[in-house]
């Protein structure tokens, strides 16, 4: 190494290295120092010390030496993870290596030394002591070696005048072909060198031990070659006909062998032959240049083409060698009836004909054949037996050679039952009859399915039965009756017809709380769905017709009002649906008699009371009058006949004067009697009777009388002279005579006597008396008419015993006499002749002495016309009629006057008996008088009052007509109108009174779709106009309250309230948002319909109107939106329920969602949250459950009645996941259930073993006893009992030894363990009438609950 002045660069390197050694001495650890020298070009350095872009010639490029010293921790050190390679970039301050860099450069030199020493910032202690100084010195020697090499390079050619000088103090170790390892103290040679000092050239891979290395080159053995003798040599060098690869020859096309010297066959004869000098000799069955073709058998018999060893036969031939006639292909059944089979096949063009052979599949059937031409491909075999399985074979024929047959087995249909008809129909029964079959079969199945598909009845009958009476049907229900013939597993096409049972009417009708005008009716409603209850009642004799009320169906009672008292009524209550009316429930009742009303006293006397009352409305024939004194004495009862007028009178006689009586009057009709109408009344005090003047003097008058019968205090006698000064005297009640004295002589006295009791006074008895003697002096005539006269006279004194009145016409000698009582003071003469003079005389008789007669004369007046009457009255005229008078006269005078107007009169001849009055005013009251006239004398006036007729209103019309209203309008008459009378007629008339100022009237509460006749006339007082009329028909009222409910994905239930009027049907139209529209005709009796087949998540608008003939009502409408489907292919009823199918019924599920495994099941969507698959039901015993293994495996029965779903289906369903089991049992109103939280049935290999979980419920646990048991039937005994449990207990079950429950036992059998038993509920001696077994997914309740909550959110 040179001096410091000579080589400052080296000096700097040594300084740095010494620092490194010092650090190593101060902090010893076991490390490994690696020094790497990297020669590189140095960029030029500018004057300021920066780098310049200078590119000297190649030989003069500067040299840069980078020395990197990495002091590394050994690999096995625990701290090695903290160190990084020298070449890595350090990314963070904490993990960076401690780096010391020094750069030494000479501006005059083109050599730069860079020293970078990397020390780990953190290092663990080395496990050994400080490295030996020898190793460090070796590093220094290496450094000086590199410096010596640098001197050699930097000669005058590259460094020019700045060439470095120095001396070589160190020889190169490892000959410059390797590195010296301080660890092993030996050379590690570079590739291609070897030896202790790496001075010996080395052969590649040591010639692979297959040759000798000479001066670095391999001399290979004979069979090998290549640079390293690793390649195999090929035989003969492949003879220039191939390529040597890994010692094997890849020969050119057409040559082969190890050395490619042999000719080669095409494709090596495909492995189906051997190559002979380039030519293939093929094995048997192959041919071709390369033996690639297959030979065909028998050269395809000349009837085909050989391809790939297979014969492609000509039409009509087949087989491996085309030697056989080909059978028809694709034989199929295209039609089956009860007597024929239609077959089709693919025709072969070469066939000359086909032979069709068929015979019954059962034993003993004869074989029949038919031949058809070869161009046929269909045939219909006829005249077959219904319900028979036939084996059918078809042969193709070519040149009398038959092909092998193609066969099929076909069963003809059973014939459709014929002649289905209904013999008798009641509310709950239908008797059906049909025609028998002439061929053997197993039996009949008849079903009665209601229109709403809820319930239904199915019965199986022997083949000999052709009539059937089905009982227990619902009244008023439409049923589809279907009759099907059965044979083996076949069913005939159904014969069906619809029939409706009669609607049942109300029953147990009861009439109670009957009074005179009210009766209360109760009944039991009908079971059938009806539109209305008709209540009809009327009088038993038919008077007044019948009144009908149309009541709403829920009503079961009604109060009849405004009845006629005492009348017998007939009552009928029936049900109505559409035009069908049930048989009525009949009753009769009689209203009570109403009591007489307005009881009053018309007149009273001391011994009588005259009673008057208004008659009862009832046709009472008499009245029972009961009366007695208030003290209860003198009780009397009398029966009084009913008067013909509105009132009846009765006089109670022989009463005690001055006494108060209690009176009760009841109406009596037959055996009925009304409640009494009561009152109190008092008789008058009776007067003294027979008051007589017994004697008379100049100053006194003696009187006598008969005493009053009633209790009195005294008598009061009043006497009054003509001068008018009255006097009175009181007489004891015990006296009956009195003499009045000190009277004025020759004076007339008026004497009266009354009886008194307290303030009550009797009527007075009066008599006129005269002191001294006074005869009758004059007759007085008054009220003279053409036929009568009144005569009065004064009292004689003393009083006469009797009076004799004599009268006669003047010119007649035969007078007439009247004998009168001496007390009489007047008389009336009647029946006299008109215009005749009469002589009248009166004689008073005293004992045997008669007074002188007192005489007078009169002349009667003219008689008036008789029988005056009016006829032919019009608005402005009328005719009066009369009969002529008796007395002669000159003419008639007729006068008439309006109520407010002048009087007109006219004279007509005496021979007239009628007269026409004209030019009168309409609706005017006229007073008409007719009298006869003779000279100046006129008769009395015969008069009559009448009215001219009113003019009628005009142009009555009905406008603004609706279903329940119409407006009547008219033009009024000319005269004033007090009121209009409208008579509105449908079936019966209704009278309406309208004020006369109106010219229109609004009719309301009309019946829709009804024709009305309106007649009207005007009235004014007693006057009425002519009647005018019009007709109109109300519009059809629409249904109301259209509602959509039970909306699911594909259906919705529409319901409505029917219109009031009669209709023919409904027109229902529904339209979706996409514009599609459908119209349905719905029967009139329906009030709901379920729309099916709707689109999911679609809004529908529904419009409904009623129709009657060509009439249409208005529309009502509603909208609804169908739901979406959660499960595209539901695998159980729970998924159907979550799809929105909420109605219980028959659904289709897909096992595991696979559409190819569809099963029809009955879903219970209501019990305990719904979603149950019902797999067994017992309810009426119509289905036989004592069946074989095959039946229980596949299932049987009617899903809507009694059935068993089938063990295979139950296994498949329960294999979908965890299911729970519920068993519902009912006995009348009593119910119980059992619940098991796990349920599964094994497959057929396990004999359908039962697996159930924990029990819960109300019935007790009777099923756990059967846990793990296989299923047993009468023909598969899998129980552990000595006997066959299924045979012993007439069922099929998971029997053990034998059972605690037997839900498939015999229906209705109560013998021990023989029926449908559940031991822990009803024991073994009770057959449960209703059982349902059902299953659903165990987590359904949670899932459905989450679904509902999500929908709410």
Curated annotation (Swiss-Prot):
Q: Which residues form a coiled coil?
A: 132-156
Keyword Repeat set for record? yes
Pfam families membership: EGF_TEN, EGF_Tenascin, Fibrinogen_C, fn3
Protein name in UniProt: Tenascin-R
Q: Which Gene3D superfamilies match?
A: Gamma Fibrinogen, chain A, domain 1 (3.90.215.10), Immunoglobulins (2.60.40.10), Laminin (2.10.25.10)
Upper lineage? Eukaryota, Metazoa, Chordata, Craniata, Vertebrata
Q: Which domain of life is it from?
A: Eukaryota
Start and end residues of each EGF-like domain: 187-198, 234-260, 265-291, 292-323
Q: State the signal peptide span.
A: 1-33
Residue span, Fibrinogen C-terminal domain: 1124-1339
Q: What is its main location?
A: secreted
Identify the PROSITE patterns for this entry. EGF_1, EGF_2, FIBRINOGEN_C_2, FN3
List the expressing tissues: Brain specific.
All residue ranges annotated as the Fibronectin type-III domain in the record: 327-419, 420-504, 505-594, 595-686, 687-776, 777-863, 864-952, 953-1037, 1038-1126
Subunit details for this protein? Answer: Forms homodimers and homotrimers. Interacts with CNTN1, NFASC and CSPG5.
Record note on domains: The N-terminus cysteine-rich segment may mediate the formation of oligomers. The fibronectin type-III 2-3 mediate the binding to contactin 1. The fibronectin type-III 9 mediates the cell attachment. The fibronectin type-III 2-5 mediate NFASC binding. The fibrinogen C-terminal domain mediates interaction with CSPG5.
Subcellular location(s): the record lists: Secreted, Extracellular space, Extracellular matrix
Q: What does this protein do?
A: Neural extracellular matrix (ECM) protein involved in interactions with different cells and matrix components. Involved in cell attachment and neurite formation. Interaction with CNTN1 enhances the neurite outgrowth.
Q: Name one GO biological process term.
A: cell adhesion
* Disulfide pairings: 296-306, 313-322
Annotated glycan sites: 179, 197, 277, 391, 469, 580, 734, 790, 872, 1031, 1041, 1256, 1342
Please provide the record's keywords in A-Z order: Cell adhesion, Coiled coil, Disulfide bond, EGF-like domain, Extracellular matrix, Glycoprotein, Repeat, Secreted, Signal
The family assignment reads: Belongs to the tenascin family.
List the record's Gene Ontology CC terms alphabetically: extracellular region
